[in-house]
Amino acid sequence: MAAKDIRFGEDARSRMVRGVNVLANAVKATLGPKGRNVVLEKSFGAPTITKDGVSVAKEIELADKFENMGAQMVKEVASRTNDDAGDGTTTATVLAQALIREGAKAVAAGMNPMDLKRGIDKAVVAAVNELKSISKPTADDKAIAQVGTISANSDESIGQIIADAMKEVGKEGVITVEEGSGLDNELDVVKGMQFDRGYLSPYFINNQQSQTADLDDPFILLHDKKISNVRDLLPVLEGVAKAGKPLLIVAEEVEGEALATLVVNTIRGIVKVVAVKAPGFGDRRKAMLEDMAVLTGGTVISEEVGLSLEKATIKDLGRAKKVQVSKENTTIIDGVGDKAAVDSRVAQIKTQIQDTSSDYDREKLQERVAKLAGGVAVIKVGASTEIEMKEKKDRVDDALHATRAAVEEGVVPGGGVALVRAVSALAGLKGANEDQNHGIQIALRAMEAPLREIVANAGEEPSVIVNKVKEGTGSFGYNAATGEFGDMLQFGILDPTKVTRSALQNAASIAGLMITTEAMVAEAPKKDEPAMGGAGGMGGMGGMGGMDF
């Protein structure tokens, strides 16, 4: 086992604080409407230019192992806030730096670290309650657009396109962000349930202009096995033909005689049919077929539930207002399923989302919710260069997460004002002893740090602005973009409550751990290995010159 380098007390904390300051100073330069960019070197290709706090934090590794531990712990604040709320990483870093710096000074002055931590925790709990009390729900598209604009560094076009996307697919709908091919941002909306499987034969096409198979008011057969024998399908086909409606078949596979018969019937106009493969694989395929059954009011024909294809009737089929099948995608629009059953299915999937620890599974489950609840919107980000594209895509991602958080828990006045108002409301808060009181004061001072940093990045004097904001009430604050004082809600400067709350809670959590750290252990640097000696002593072999070769 390698030797360890161990540091104690003030020596350990001071090194840790140095690491915190290096990382936080790099990250906080990006805060606010006049925050600066940070350029990140990449191992290959052009460097990345970003104003995204968590992207900056993730790139930082320090040479000194003890300083690096401090930096990595603050990086955890940014990452956790990003995971919880999708935004607010820079605010969380600024709060953590202020708490750690002041906390370390108090410990060095002889105060009890545990009491300081208890004081900080007490202040944070009270501040979170105050934030919740001043929070306002996001009632309209305008508020959603404003939140998106602020999070995208005051880019109104990004805020507006996110508001448009939410309006189209609903607040439960999935909105994805992709790199576009043009210079402008574009919004592409798919309503209904779409999955990535197309027609199994081009002979099913009935709309030559769009090269799609369009079915109006069709029946929908859902089967979890292969269909190769046409005899199994006859009862269903006869029932559909009598009803005079088209039919969509979604099965694991439709092949051989069955596919050929369906094509012939379609060409002759006897029954209008389109066959597609079921999406997904294994258990995910079964779940998606079940989703389609709920959406269309049908039943999955499966031996697992005692149903066989040859005994299926028209009552087992789903219905929808319209189905469109292209070469690569199938879209089911306006399924006739019971709304209560759909809502119940959505609630069930949401429970699975909360329980899963896999990001991939969570993403797939969220897609299923969207397909049941409303639809999918794709924001295609436009830019003139690849570097600009990456930077802009990061901002759109941030803005999207912020708007989702705003819809979830409401909004508070932005620009650091909400935290300053929380400080005013907690003026009379007291702890069990003087050290706890000092911890409370550390937390209250730290809550002013985001506003101070926003003002400093705008080139103004922080103390003057902060004092003027503290003199005001409600949503009165400072608009750093224009240099004006006024009502932040009227300026359209809003922060999601969830983002501000997560930033404060995560910063306090890590700060409490660092203040109460008394020892640090790291691997000792390896000393250079000495060169191998002794090989030079073979000179005596020169006496072998008399040997014949």
Swiss-Prot record:
SUPFAM superfamilies: GroEL apical domain-like, GroEL equatorial domain-like, GroEL-intermediate domain like
Database matches in InterPro entries: Chaperonin_Cpn60_CS (IPR018370), Cpn60/GroEL (IPR001844), Cpn60/GroEL/TCP-1 (IPR002423), GroEL-like_apical_dom_sf (IPR027409), GROEL-like_equatorial_sf (IPR027413), TCP-1-like_intermed_sf (IPR027410)
EC identifiers of the protein: 5.6.1.7
Any one annotated GO CC term: cytoplasm
Binding, ATP: 30-33, 51, 87-91, 415, 479-481, 495
Subcellular location: Cytoplasm
Keywords: ATP-binding, Chaperone, Cytoplasm, Isomerase, Nucleotide-binding
Role summary: Together with its co-chaperonin GroES, plays an essential role in assisting protein folding. The GroEL-GroES system forms a nano-cage that allows encapsulation of the non-native substrate proteins and provides a physical environment optimized to promote and accelerate protein folding.
Protein name: Chaperonin GroEL
High-level lineage: Bacteria, Pseudomonadati, Pseudomonadota, Gammaproteobacteria, Lysobacterales
